[in-house]
């Protein structure tokens, strides 16, 4: 595990953040993130789907529109989300969405109680700095469960 460091030049110019599958853009965590970084433009995006391919399409479209709206190159945006939203963002980046960084909050490493059904097949294609935040009580993946899979991510990773 290495720490993701940004220079002024490489620092993300905006953040597209998505909630879990059953939540919307007004989820308390997304609001707290937006309010916690007032200097960074933030787009809180409701996905309104549990289909990863549909979510990926929505993330890409919203990211391109947001970059245009704030006047930055789309590859200067960071993407992330909570649970399903983070998973969808990670798949989008793995499939080629240019991004400055990835933020995965309570990433669903596996379905609760199904430790053998890992959602890490796309990790090697993630080549951007990635922050993973997980708690000891998270039924979708605890920090020690992530340890064996972080090295699969091609970009720098930080676990918190």
Per-range role (PLM):
Residues 126-127, 132-134, 138:
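Short beta-strand/loop motif that positions the catalytic acidic residue
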């Amino acid at each position: 595990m290495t720490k993701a460091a940004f220079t002024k030049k490489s620092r993300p110019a905006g953040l597209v953040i998505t909630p879990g599958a059953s939540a919307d853009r007004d989820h308390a965590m997304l609001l707290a993130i937006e309010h916690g970084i007032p200097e960074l433009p933030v787009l809180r995006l409701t996905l309104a789907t549990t289909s990863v391919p549909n979510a990926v399409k929505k993330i890409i479209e919203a990211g391109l529109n947001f970059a245009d709206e704030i006047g930055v190159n789309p590859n200067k945006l960071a993407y992330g989300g909570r649970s399903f939203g983070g998973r969808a963002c990670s798949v989008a980046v793995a499939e080629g969405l240019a991004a400055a960084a990835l933020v995965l909050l309570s990433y669903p490493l596996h379905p609760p109680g199904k430790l053998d059904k890992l959602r890490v097949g796309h990790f090697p294609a993630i080549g951007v700095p990635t922050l993973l935040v997980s708690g000891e009580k998270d039924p979708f993946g605890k920090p020690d469960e992530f340890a064996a899979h972080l090295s699969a991510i091609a970009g720098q990773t930080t676990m918190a």
